[in-house]
Amino acid sequence: MLTIHAAPLLLPVGAAPVPDGAVAVDGGRIAALGPYDEVAAAAPGARVRRWPGVLTPGLRQWHAPWLLRRCYHPDPREYDALGELPLWGADLAALELTETRWSGSVRRGLQRMLGHGTTALAAPGARFTDPLVAQAVARSGLRVVPVTGAPGLLLGDRPDLDPFAEGHDLAGTVHGPLEVGARADLAVFDAEDETALTAKGAASCVATVIEGRLLYRSR
């Protein structure tokens, strides 16, 4: 089914921002993008999803292997004891983690990446060798891409689920621009423009679409 994702501002990357913009998705590919009126006129009968904020390409997470196997993502039932943030280093070493707990952590980590507008995970050789992680990633729908061009270092005091934590602008954080014929990997953020988005960070994510499928929405 043809679906149109529309937002007050479309930031395709590599092309000018489009006020009241839209992206038409046919299956898993982008069929059209531009001003909403033009996209809608070319796709009569399409389902329309209207989002607040900015519509962008999906983001790329450079440190997925670290975040998924060297960090523990607490279950909500553990928040009182462990907090909500990923645990690593000495805090991780203090936990007694069975494979069952690790499996739950990896699944939660992937869900939280989706909740940060992430659609692509960078990994050496564009694959995960850890079977537990590889299986969970395959089920998640997240795309695995090479680490070519990675900054190579974790910035800040701790691993961060926010791809913008590397300090890049939008163009340096997405996996690729929105283009007709490309995979429909999109993200929507509750921000007025790119400046506001990079200031607020990817936790402002409203929705994440991978290959045309809506895999996360916060509202």
Name what the model sees in each region:
Residues 6-8, 52, 122-127, 190:
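Structural motif
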